[in-house]
Amino acid sequence: MMKIRASHILVDTKEQAENLLLDLKNGVAFEDLAKQYSKCPSGRDGGDLRWFGKGMMVKPFEDAAFALKEGEVSEPVETQFGWHLIKLTGIDE
């Protein structure tokens, strides 16, 4: 089964996520933004969620993460937890 490794930043609003996406486009490191702004405990690790397969994350998050190319960052994704920016950091087929 294919697994991916991803990092994410979890915030309360779409506006916050969009502002962080602008910071990323302006060259701020994803890991630094995760440490500073993410509400998820993974923020301490730069947002790293380690390796996971399909069925291990909530559906909107999983769909967005598995659609990314390695190194790519998603548009803001809404789940019941809030708004995520997801960065795909590895693919293990």
Predicted regions and their residues:
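Well-structured core secondary-structure elements of compact alpha/beta domains
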Residues: M1-N26, P41-M57, I86-E93
